[in-house]
């Protein structure tokens, strides 16, 4: 392995490590990942300027590109989930406030008038927030179920069915073949 190949292999390993970290741990240090990726970009830029790439180097560059795409998508998804959670808790705090606007209750009444089989975004945020908080043991106790019923305005059976379906969805989540290949190479 030439020096470029060794450096590219190391970059690929580091990106794969970040992907595994994000896949396995709900909490990670985004600043650490950002700093590492920026350092890797600088290293790759200098390697590309040398213009002495072997076939092995080109293959490693393709793998790094694939890892970068996966890492990018995972980061975007995490950011979206985080923003949804922040928005949910901000809205919840505002609605719990004694100074909350009466327009909020009008919106909720409008939600009831629409005969839709799907849950509203607010209901999904509440339920998903509860599920993420209780992911280690996603079985609601009676008081938690009652709290979810009050905050979502759903029936007991709807709440219980949603939690049951969400547990099943979590259990059946499969890793895509592309991601599995990347995780196995690391």
Curated annotation (Swiss-Prot):
Keyword line: DNA-binding, Homeobox, Nucleus, Repressor, Transcription, Transcription regulation
Upregulation: Induced by HBR1 in response to hemoglobin and growth signals.
Provenance organism: Candida albicans (strain SC5314 / ATCC MYA-2876)
DNA-binding region of this protein: 112-174
More details: The C.albicans mating-type-like (MTL) locus contains, in addition to the genes for the regulatory proteins (MTLA1, MTLA2, MTLALPHA1 and MTLALPHA2), a and alpha idiomorphs of a phosphatidylinositol kinase (PIKA and PIKALPHA), a poly(A) polymerase (PAPA and PAPALPHA) and an oxysterol binding protein-like protein (OBPA and OBPALPHA). MTLALPHA2 is not represented in the genomic sequence of strain SC5314 because that haploid assembly includes the mating type a allele of this locus.
InterPro entries per record: HD, Homeodomain-like_sf, KN_HD
Domain of life: Eukaryota
MF annotations from Gene Ontology: DNA binding; DNA-binding transcription factor activity
Keyword Cell membrane: no
GO BP term (any one): cell differentiation
Record bears the keyword DNA-binding: yes
Compartments where located: Nucleus
Membership in a protein family: Belongs to the TALE/M-ATYP homeobox family.
Annotated Pfam families: Homeobox_KN
Biological function: Mating type proteins are sequence specific DNA-binding proteins that act as master switches in yeast differentiation by controlling gene expression in a cell type-specific fashion. Transcriptional corepressor that acts in conjunction with A1 to repress transcription both of homozygote-specific genes and of genes necessary for the white-opaque switch, a prerequisite for mating.
Subunit organization: Forms a heterodimer with A1.
Protein name: Mating-type-like protein ALPHA2
Annotated Gene Ontology cellular component terms: nucleus
